[in-house]
């Protein structure tokens, strides 16, 4: 007696083939992702070392220049700063529409919001218009690092996402060569070529009320108050509010 062959329908064979192809593709994708992650980890570590060396050399150079100026009986003048950090210190009471609009353009919608800005003529003109409502100055490396690591949120798909993973930074800014938090810090601190994209990715910082409170919000900093330009002393205020 001849045994009858079981004929597998063509649709089943096609489905089986598709499933095998999908399984192979999935396996290849997982392996590619693992390889990319390993390469990224090496690159991130290398860049972090490079940035650390760069910051240390700049600090060493600054100390040397200050010492040299002192020996010559003069004093060292810092090169013009490129980066500002602005904090809104007053609410909406008695605020005129134009001032309100500028504060919105600066992304300072709430009291104790803080943002980074590039120093240029347009920025300084806007700050003068809203000076009674803000305080600002030149953030140092420690301030930029602590703000981004402690209070940093990014904008990804129109959502506010905590910067808990380098992959979040890479998703948003990888096309600009910014693949980790240390890259982001470096781009902001040095006001790099993709500062605009990096800064727009950062959500405005929500700071806490400063320890010890503020003195006189309506008065200028140089008059013993809090508003306006406090230059390098912004770093002391950032510590109290972070």
Curated annotation (Swiss-Prot):
Keywords, sorted A to Z: Ribonucleoprotein, Ribosomal protein
Pfam families for this protein: Ribosomal_L30, Ribosomal_L30_N
Organism name: Arabidopsis thaliana (Mouse-ear cress)
Name of this protein: Large ribosomal subunit protein uL30y
GO biological process terms held by the UniProt record: maturation of LSU-rRNA from tricistronic rRNA transcript (SSU-rRNA, 5.8S rRNA, LSU-rRNA)
Keyword Ribosomal protein set for record: yes
Cited InterPro entries: Ribo_uL30_ferredoxin-like_sf (IPR036919), Ribosomal_uL30 (IPR039699), Ribosomal_uL30_CS (IPR018038), Ribosomal_uL30_euk (IPR005998), Ribosomal_uL30_euk_arc (IPR035808), Ribosomal_uL30_ferredoxin-like (IPR016082), Ribosomal_uL30_N_euk (IPR012988)
GO molecular function terms listed in the Swiss-Prot or TrEMBL record: mRNA binding; structural constituent of ribosome
